[in-house]
């Protein structure tokens, strides 16, 4: 089933163009120039970078919801308009989706990076990270329960995407230090900065000059490899860090 993330209608031709969701989720991963901030919250080296990239790969997971997909009907989504859904933004829906999976350890084990922490403990320490990532539109998402925005097929497809996306980040690891109270406090302190990084990644990943829209399904690994090469050009447009003047 095809899920869209972005849509634009040509004002002259009247023809709509979509960008498939799976590929938008991946190109948002292309910012690793935040080492100082991430190091302060326990993310270091390649495993930390891949953890953050893995986290970003689900930033718009709420767009799998039928209530979002029915805004632009594509092949395979024709039934969405017939379903009565609650009116929530995709950031709230994404957070709610993750919180639901947190209650299912067997499923959770299949989509989380490795860690010395147990599955239940990993779910606990990841809650703030999921909130920061899904809430990348200026406000932390509030937990909503008993939502009917996702059909059973929506949930199955979103879960399948998360399973496949995890394979792209083999070195990703959830640090044991995440359970420490001091690290949790620092994560909350820097949460707005981290969310800002997610926004910046989203903006860069949405730049069609570097990342062309894709409306036909291709293997995630193929698209990811291509996106990585384009990311080098995309990140080159960012200004360098300012130097501190000596007085």
Where are the model-predicted features located?
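Conserved mid-sequence domains
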Residues: 246-247
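Accessory nucleic-acid engagement/destabilization modules that flank
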Residues: 2-15, 19-243
């Amino acid at each position: 089933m095809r899920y869209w993330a972005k849509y634009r209608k040509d004002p002259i031709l009247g023809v709509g163009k979509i960008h498939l969701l799976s590929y938008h989720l991946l190109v948002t991963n292309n910012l690793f120039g935040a080492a100082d901030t991430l190091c302060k919250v326990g993310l270091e080296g390649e495993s930390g970078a891949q953890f953050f990239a893995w986290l970003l790969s689900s930033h718009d997971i709420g767009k799998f919801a039928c209530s979002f997909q029915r805004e632009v009907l594509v092949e395979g989504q024709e039934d969405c308009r017939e379903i009565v859904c609650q009116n929530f933004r995709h950031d709230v829906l994404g957070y709610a989706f993750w919180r639901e999976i947190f209650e299912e350890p067997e499923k959770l084990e299949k989509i989380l990076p490795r860690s010395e922490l147990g599955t239940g403990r990993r779910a606990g320490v990841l809650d703030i990270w999921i909130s920061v990532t899904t809430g990348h539109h200026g406000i932390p998402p509030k937990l909503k329960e008993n939502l009917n925005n996702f059909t059973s097929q929506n949930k199955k497809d979103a879960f399948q995407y998360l399973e496949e996306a995890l394979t792209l980040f083999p070195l990703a690891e959830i640090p044991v230090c995440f359970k420490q109270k001091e690290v949790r406090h620092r994560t909350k302190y820097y949460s707005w900065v981290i969310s800002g990084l997610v926004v910046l990644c989203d903006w860069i990943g949405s730049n069609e000059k570097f990342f062309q829209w894709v409306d036909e399904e291709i293997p995630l690994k193929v698209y990811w490899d291509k996106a990585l090469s384009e990311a080098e050009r995309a990140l080159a447009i960012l200004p360098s860090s300012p130097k501190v003047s000596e007085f």
